[in-house]
């Protein structure tokens, strides 16, 4: 239960990777809002992709401007921080193929300038956004106890709690 887990933590956070395809604003918005609800305040996006990932069936890169839109989308849902994984390409192993801000020699990759632009924009907007809150006109209740109960005693084999939640979101 993420709500119980978050009680003793300083902040709530999540990792956001697209994998194959491109930004799905509804799904990511729902997860942003759920994460904000764990502590009933702002959250951090502690990992998001700088370009492509290395573990999906098709590891396409993000379109130009897509990472910037993703960062502002997170802020609009209450993120206080947007962090990228990873900074520099690994010298070996699976993650050497994961998108990064700089290559193994420290030279900027194509995504570096977009991340730098996001940082500049955040620096300008920070005084306006500090201590702001997200105001919602409606709420959807999320219950892990109900979700787990339904998983163990399905009333219909095709029922998917998360898909049902996202349908109403």
Question: Where are the model-predicted features located?
Answer:
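Carbohydrate-binding surfaces of carbohydrate-active enzymes
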Residues: 6-169
């Amino acid at each position: 239960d993420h709500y119980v887990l978050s009680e003793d933590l300083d902040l709530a956070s999540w990792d956001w990777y697209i994998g194959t395809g491109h930004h799905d604003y509804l799904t990511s918005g729902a997860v942003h809002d759920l994460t904000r609800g764990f502590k009933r305040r702002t959250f951090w996006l502690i990992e998001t992709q700088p370009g492509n990932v290395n573990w999906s069936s098709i590891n396409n890169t993000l379109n130009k401007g897509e990472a910037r839109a993703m960062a502002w989308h997170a802020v609009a849902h209450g993120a206080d921080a947007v962090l990228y994984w990873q900074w520099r390409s690994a010298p070996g192993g699976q993650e050497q193929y994961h998108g990064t801000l700089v290559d193994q020699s420290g030279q900027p990759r194509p995504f570096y300038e977009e991340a730098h632009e996001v940082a500049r924009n955040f620096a300008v907007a920070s005084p306006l956004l500090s201590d702001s809150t997200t105001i919602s006109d409606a709420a959807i209740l999320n219950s892990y106890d109900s979700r787990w109960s339904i998983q163990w005693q399905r009333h219909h084999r095709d029922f998917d709690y998360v898909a049902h939640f996202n349908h109403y979101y």
